[in-house]
Structure formats: C-alpha cells, structure tokens
Amino acid sequence: MKYIIFDFDGTIGDSQSLIVKTLQDTMRARKLEVKSDEECAKTIGLRLDEAFVSLFDMSDEEGMECAATYREIFLDNKKTMIVQPFPHVIETLRALHHQGYVLGMASSRNHCSLDGYVKQMQLEDIFSSIVAGDDVEHVKPAPDMVFKALGEMRGMKNPVTSPDDVKDMLEETLVVGDMNFDVDMAHHAGCRACSVTYGNGTREQLAAAEWIIDDFAELQKILKG
C-alpha cells in the first residue's frame, strides 16, 4: 500500500455524541419526530441532507432545509462538545506520514467544518488531500471521493472523478473508515478497505472489509503485511 484515505467521523474524531445531539436538536427545531440515538448514529457518514431524507419521508429540498438548520445549531453545540481524536490516532498518522505513506481524507462533512477539525488536531501538514462532501457531486458510497483524493495526491490541478486518471493507483490504495458506506466506497472505486470497530458501525455491518481492526494502531501491522 502507498495511498491511504481516511474517513473522519468515527474513525479519526470521536464525534458521535455531538452529531447525534445536533441531529436531535434540529428535529426539535423543525417540529419533527425526535429519532433515537441509535437511529441517528446509523446516518453518520451520509451527507446531512441525505441523512434527514433517510430518517424521514421528506423531499430533497426539505432535507437541504434541515441541513441548513443543523449547521446553525452545530455552531453552538460544538462550543461545549469538543471532538477529540480516538486513542492512538495522532501518533499513528504521524508515523505513517513519516514512513512515506501518502495520506488523504474523505468525509461527508462540508469543507469548512472538516478543515476546522483537521487544524484543531494539528494534522493539516500530513494530509496531501482533504475531500469534503461539498467537493463532489456524489458522496459515499459512490467512489467519487476516492478518485478526487487520488487525483489531488497525484498533484492534478483539477482532479476528475473518473477512474481512468488514477486507475494505476487503486491497487495501492486503502480506505479506512467506520461505516459500511466507507467499505462500499472503497470497493466501488476498486480499492481495498479497512474498518474500525470503535466508531459508528457494527462488526456485522463492516464484514465486507478486507481488514477489521479494534484499535487504530493496528493499522501499522496490516500495512507491514
């Protein structure tokens, strides 16, 4: 492996409580039925508007309106609910970068939010590509984020979402995430997946991944083969 693309929520950052609370606060603000913690957690990894559409029988336009409300509430909630990295994440990422792996990030978050957390964790110097939900037309489980990330890793000024420009990189690419959306994105792109069990997905949901780990530090063992 040479290229590694990481999810953020539930993989690098422990954000479940913040996301679930903000989803539920948004439901209250929009006079919607408040879904359970478990129901909300299952949508983590989807783009916000898609999360609301999946939870409620609503139109795409209504989903966008809910997403806008969510972002307003999120700005207040994040002041008191700090997202911390999971154990062994920071030191492992820095070790991989030092060892010569090319690292990228693919998250359904919008770029403003994602960049803020990357800077908070002081990780901006180790990622060659950061792809957010508002950077592509089709988010997870579509493969667009993988193709765009690899294009940026290659130094393309205007990375395309076609596999043709990066097909020689796919066999050397690993996607690391905590949800079935991440596994599906990897496989749709033509690369392999490693799932973490400490995030938002269950081991059963992640069974299709080539590797499953319980601790982020175990990634080093997988890469050493």
Predicted regions and their residues:
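Short phosphate-binding/catalytic loops that engage adenosine nucleotides
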Residues: 32, 101, 191
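Alpha-helical elements of Rossmann-like donor-binding domains used by nucleotide-donor carbohydrate transfer enzymes
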Residues: 21-25, 50-51, 69, 91, ...
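A metal-dependent, Asp-based hydrolase signature
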Residues: 45-77, 87-95
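Short alpha-helical
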Residues: 18, 47-50, 84, 91, ...
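Short, acidic loop-to-helix structural element flanking the phosphoryl-transfer center
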Residues: 76-105, 111-115, 143
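Asp-based, Mg2+/Mn2+-dependent phosphohydrolase catalytic module
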Residues: 1-2, 97, 111, 116-225
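Short, surface-exposed acidic
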Residues: 33-39, 58-68, 158-171
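Active-site neighborhood of HAD-like aspartate-dependent phosphohydrolases
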Residues: 1-42, 56
